[in-house]
Amino acid sequence: MYAENDTIVAIATPPGKGGVGVVRVSGPKARAIAHEVLGYDPKPRHAHYSPFFNEEGDTLDSGIALLFIAPNSFTGEDVVEFQGHGGPVVLDILVKRIVSLGARLARPGEFSERAFMNDKLDLVQAEAIADLIEATSEQAAHSAMRSLQGQFSKEIENLIESLIQLRIYVEAAIDFPEEEIDFLSDGKVLNDLDTLLSQTQSVFASAKQGALMREGMTVVIAGRPNAGKSSLLNALAGRESAIVTEIEGTTRDVLREHIHIDGMPLHIVDTAGLRDSDDVVEKIGIERAWKEIDQADRILFLVDATQTNEVSPERIWPEFYARIEHHDHITVVRNKIDLSEEAQGIDLSLSHPVIRLSAKAGNGIDVLREHLKACVGFESHAEGGFMARRRHLEALTVAEKHIQLAKQQLLSANAGELVAEDLRVAQNALSEITGAFTSDDLLGRIFSSFCIGK
């Protein structure tokens, strides 16, 4: 275990060579370390160009030093940043010098963790820092910045405040039992519960869009050999990612592509043709293909339109259909319509969606892209969204469930104690999102996924 009031140091810029490298120090010894490295006490919040000295007074490097005094810093502690040349060796030398002066190497995410512990930002904002760094599209970067600025946190805090006010009202009825029936049957509690449900569902819908922006969806292209799976992968990716030949079994392993559809990450997996094979390498690829299919958000069941007019996967390939656990994840894709002379488009009236396209000619690819967005409810034109994570959705789901339970308790039993308890559980679930009510284990998992120096 580390002391909570010790001083930490880390390189804050990415590994490798660059024009500038930043070493960040935070903790009670930051000012003393700055004095030893610079040879003088820097003025807070001013940029000082200076040599960086070792213990013998020799120059290690030169650059800019910035000192921030607690609580007016990112971490809420004394912080000093040394901005020198971006070579890994010279940065390591500077870090060793700072460690010799009483600092220790920071854990991944420890600077952000200290900012959270010192109330400089909440847990959603801390996560947004990592999401901003990892953003893979402009839309994702904008959404992460809105979360960092507190937009998502404000939505959650408003829900929590409404829950608190309703709990106060209900618990007042419990404290004055002779008034309880009047309190709980006057319509206010029911109306407030309905309002809370509506607000929670609205925040969940926005958070779901943010989670899709961050995590995207995984789509597996599956089917018999030579149905055109690799051609479809290339068409969706917009480049030649997979080898396409007329020879069955060309794809022997799982191929992956990562693209964006209007800002939503799409993880495309092209599987080996599913068939019985004596080839050892191909058999391994087929087993991997089944694992990917089991984990997919959507399965594109590719059919060669020149071989059959059937659209039911259960009839086309009964063995494949029987092995699939989530039949509602299947979309039938009739490929090669340029040869079968079918019209491109989508049919949603059947047991499974059916899309007719030509991967080789590119006809119907836009229809497929729009269908994939619709499958997960992604709204590409939604404005002002914020970034969210799976754990946020889970917490909102728990909160909504217990608000629903509170409503049921009110209507069925008029039981104030049970209503108040469900409201308390809902409040705690929402408080986990911002970190106001969070286990140390969860904090450890979140911050350990951050970069060192953040």
UniProtKB/Swiss-Prot annotation:
TrmE-type G domain mapped to chain residues: 216-377
Cofactor: record remark: Binds 1 potassium ion per subunit.
UniProt: (6S)-5-formyl-5,6,7,8-tetrahydrofolate binding residues: 24, 81, 120, 454
EC annotation from Swiss-Prot or TrEMBL: 3.6.-.-
Binding annotation for Mg(2+): 230, 251
Pfam families reported for this sequence: MMR_HSR1 (PF01926), MnmE_helical (PF12631), TrmE_N (PF10396)
Cofactor needs: K(+)
InterPro entries on file: G_TrmE, GTP-bd, GTP-bd_TrmE_N, GTPase_MnmE, MnmE_dom2, MnmE_helical, P-loop_NTPase, Small_GTP-bd
Cellular compartment(s): Cytoplasm
Enzyme class (EC, first level): hydrolase
Residues reported in the UniProt entry to bind GTP: 226-231, 245-251, 270-273
PROSITE patterns hit by this protein: G_TRME
Alphabetized SUPFAM superfamilies for the sequence: P-loop containing nucleoside triphosphate hydrolases (SSF52540), TrmE connector domain (SSF116878)
GO cellular component, one term: cytosol
Keyword Iron recorded: no
GO molecular function annotations of the record: GTP binding; GTPase activity; metal ion binding
Keywords, in A-Z order: Cytoplasm, GTP-binding, Hydrolase, Magnesium, Metal-binding, Nucleotide-binding, Potassium, tRNA processing
Residues the record lists as binding K(+): 226, 245, 247, 250
GO biological process: tRNA methylation; tRNA wobble uridine modification
Purpose: Exhibits a very high intrinsic GTPase hydrolysis rate. Involved in the addition of a carboxymethylaminomethyl (cmnm) group at the wobble position (U34) of certain tRNAs, forming tRNA-cmnm(5)s(2)U34.
HAMAP family: GTPase_MnmE (MF_00379)
Family that this chain belongs to: Belongs to the TRAFAC class TrmE-Era-EngA-EngB-Septin-like GTPase superfamily. TrmE GTPase family.
Subunit structure of this chain's protein: Homodimer. Heterotetramer of two MnmE and two MnmG subunits.
PANTHER family, per the entry: TRNA MODIFICATION GTPASE GTPBP3 (PTHR42714), TRNA MODIFICATION GTPASE GTPBP3, MITOCHONDRIAL (PTHR42714:SF2)
Protein name stated in the entry: tRNA modification GTPase MnmE
Gene that encodes it: mnmE
